[in-house]
């Protein structure tokens, strides 16, 4: 018997059964308990979801921007009213501490919907005079039906981030959450329907990567927004282009540098480094896992980091005192433990953690201790590759030019940060770092107003911020002639 029972697809404003006859299981990563059986969508189900979205989108786009804005604001109110209920589900599904999901996941998702609800009425075209009797005007029109493919680390937040600009601009979306954390996207669908979003405007299909491929290759999907790993992102982008030249937004992986200069407030720097590596058990794409510290502060900084790691409260995610939970799945645990063994084998110095936690209730969950490696080199696997777990690599440097070159020596370019009391140095360094999201003397906040996305192989396009609306509209140019038409023939 599962906790939440059988989970169906959400198409056309309500729950429907999948036609595949297949289901998959989702588990609580803290206890191993079966949470739900989830119906897997078939190709016919994807077609049905897209057709429903096309119908709903026509009704949604015909509304005024103010009408759409009011409906989205009602959805925000409902999300906030149900915050505690949704946070409890998210904690069971992801393993995140309840204090984290209560304060972050639904809250920040609702903030983004509220932000775009306010911008819905600000989508407008231009008027361009050509001469006394002729002018051009432009219209920003919705794309139509978009596909959203979510990652397992922030299920409901990612669903909100992808739907908010799409719906504000008059589009519909068919969303596929990760099969690892599939539950809360369905709750978001319920909320949109209750708020007054027309049937079909937000549909949820469940399943593995094969369902994502069906969406990506579907001829009636105009755009794909994907969050996940680099290699999968490349496949999505290739299929999107090959099928129908779809627009894409890609929020992919990272191996982000955090640079601590010799004049930094070391207490602040240590606080930032620990947050940038161990928040959400290290399962955050923007984590600052390559911590570069100036050689002159190596010992003092490392000691402060280790003091803070000892204060991390690993425990049951449902306990209010816990601030560090399990990894999301057994597969992710095995991956992280493999990286830890690689670090040991390549000569990194293990300063903290490095083991799976198995005592007591930890034995039934996917727990690994917060891990810190010192004496790391740039060529180590733990320094070069994204781990997506609680593993910090500490490296030292001597000069500004040196550390910038080393920080940029990666095919990733998602995030970067510096800690220094010298603002000139801070801005000078940030301007040279090849990353799309940067922080000075802080780390990790991604407010609705801030565009987020990567350079290089960390992504294409942006999420959040005003600029994202451009990625969910297309421009129509119209010339108007008020005077005499001069024929060519």
UniProtKB/Swiss-Prot annotation:
The answer to whether the entry has keyword Ribosomal protein is: no
* Recorded GO MF terms: betaine-aldehyde dehydrogenase (NAD+) activity; metal ion binding
Cofactor descriptive note: Binds 2 potassium ions per subunit.
Q: Which residues form the signal peptide?
A: none
What keywords were assigned to this record? Metal-binding, NAD, NADP, Oxidation, Oxidoreductase, Potassium
Q: Which cofactor does it need?
A: K(+)
Q: Which PROSITE patterns match?
A: ALDEHYDE_DEHYDR_CYS (PS00070), ALDEHYDE_DEHYDR_GLU (PS00687)
Enzyme class, broadest EC rank: oxidoreductase
Q: Hey, which family's this protein in?
A: Belongs to the aldehyde dehydrogenase family.
The UniProt function text for this chain reads: Involved in the biosynthesis of the osmoprotectant glycine betaine. Catalyzes the irreversible oxidation of betaine aldehyde to the corresponding acid.
How this chain assembles, per its entry, is: Dimer of dimers.
State the name under which the record lists this protein. Answer: Betaine aldehyde dehydrogenase
Record organism: Burkholderia cenocepacia (strain ATCC BAA-245 / DSM 16553 / LMG 16656 / NCTC 13227 / J2315 / CF5610)
Provide the gene name from the record.
Answer: betB
């Amino acid at each position: 018997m599962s906790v939440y029972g059988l989970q169906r697809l959400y198409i056309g404003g309500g729950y429907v059964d999948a036609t595949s006859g297949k289901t998959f299981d989702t588990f609580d990563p803290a206890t191993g308990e079966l949470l739900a059986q989830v119906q897997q969508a078939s190709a016919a189900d994807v077609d049905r979801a897209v057709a429903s979205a096309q119908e709903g989108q026509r009704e949604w786009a015909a509304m005024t921007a103010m009408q759409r804005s009011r409906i989205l604001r009602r959805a925000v109110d409902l999300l906030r009213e149900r915050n505690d209920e949704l946070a409890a589900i998210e904690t069971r599904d992801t393993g995140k501490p309840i204090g984290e999901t209560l304060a972050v996941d639904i809250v920040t998702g609702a903030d983004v919907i509220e932000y775009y609800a306010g911008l819905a009425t600000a989508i407008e075209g231009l008027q361009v005079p050509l001469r006394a009797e002729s002018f051009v005007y432009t219209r920003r029109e919705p794309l139509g039906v978009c596909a959203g493919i979510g990652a397992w680390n922030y299920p409901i937040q990612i669903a909100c981030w992808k739907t908010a600009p799409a719906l504000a601009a008059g589009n519909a979306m068919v969303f596929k959450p990760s099969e690892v954390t599939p539950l809360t996207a369905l709750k978001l669908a319920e909320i949109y329907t209750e708020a007054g979003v027309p049937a079909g405007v937000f549909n949820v299909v469940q399943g593995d990567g094969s369902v994502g491929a069906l969406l990506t290759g579907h001829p009636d999907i105009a755009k794909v927004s994907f969050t996940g790993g680099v290699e999968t992102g490349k496949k999505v982008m290739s299929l999107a282009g090959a099928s129908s030249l779809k627009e894409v937004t890609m929020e992919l992986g990272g191996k982000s540098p955090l640079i601590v200069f010799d004049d930094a407030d070391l207490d602040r720097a240590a606080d930032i480094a620990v947050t940038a590596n161990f928040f959400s058990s290290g399962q955050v794409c923007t984590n600052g896992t390559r911590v570069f510290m100036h050689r002159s502060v190596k010992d003092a900084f490392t000691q402060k980091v280790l003091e803070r790691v000892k204060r991390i409260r690993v425990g049951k995610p449902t306990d209010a005192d816990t601030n560090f939970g399990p990894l999301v799945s057994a597969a992710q645990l095995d991956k992280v433990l493999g990286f830890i063994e690689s670090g040991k084998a390549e000569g990194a110095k293990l300063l903290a953690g490095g083991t799976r936690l198995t005592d007591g209730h930890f034995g039934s969950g996917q727990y690994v201790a917060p891990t810190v490696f010192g004496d790391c080199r740039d060529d180590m696997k733990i320094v070069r590759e994204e781990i997506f777990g609680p593993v910090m690599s500490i490296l030292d440097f001597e000069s500004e030019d040196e550390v910038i070159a080393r920080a940029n020596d990666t095919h990733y370019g998602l995030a970067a940060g510096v800690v220094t009391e010298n603002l000139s140095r801070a801005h000078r360094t940030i301007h040279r770092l090849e990353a799309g999201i940067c922080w000075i003397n802080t780390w990790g906040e991604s407010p609705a107003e801030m565009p987020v996305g990567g350079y290089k192989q960390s992504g294409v396009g942006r999420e959040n911020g005003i600029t994202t609306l451009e990625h969910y509209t297309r421009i129509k140019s119209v010339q108007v002639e008020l005077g005499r038409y001069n024929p060519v023939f």
